[in-house]
Design a protein with these regions (language model features):
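Conserved active-site and cofactor/substrate-binding residues in soluble primary-metabolism enzymes
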Residues: 24
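Peptidyl-prolyl cis-trans isomerase
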Residues: 35-73
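Second-shell loop/turn segments in exported
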Residues: 14-18, 27-37, 61-64
Length: 109
């Protein structure tokens, strides 16, 4: 019987995002989040109201995903973002402009 090698387990992350179609809209939402007394609460509120992604109904919650499941540029931004860091920039993919909030990350094990 072969042992499962846990050292090859891919990275994973639990994130929320807001997906919008235009750069000025993304900038405006980031400003609202940054200036809020409770940035995460504001993020959730804005995700529900403005996100073009079906996850908007879940306040932007994408749940946990493993490396390789999302668009490359999106994942690159996730791995470069600190946990629970207020978003200060957005990332552009073929789907539009994403504002990302990272709740947790696990590195390769």
């Amino acid at each position: 019987m072969r042992r499962h090698d846990k050292s090859n387990k891919p990275r994973s992350a639990h994130v929320r995002h807001i997906l919008v179609g235009h750069k000025p809209e993304a900038r405006d939402l980031i400003e609202q989040i940054t200036n809020a007394k409770n940035p995460l609460r504001m993020f959730k509120k804005l995700a529900k109201k403005y996100s073009n992604c079906p996850s908007g109904s879940k306040k932007g919650d994408l749940g946990e995903f493993v490396e390789g499941q999302m668009a490359v540029d999106f994942e690159t931004a996730v791995w470069a973002t600190d946990i629970d860091q207020k978003p200060s920039k957005f990332v552009k993919t073929q789907f539009g402009y994403h504002i990302i909030w990272v709740h947790s990350k696990t590195e390769h094990q």
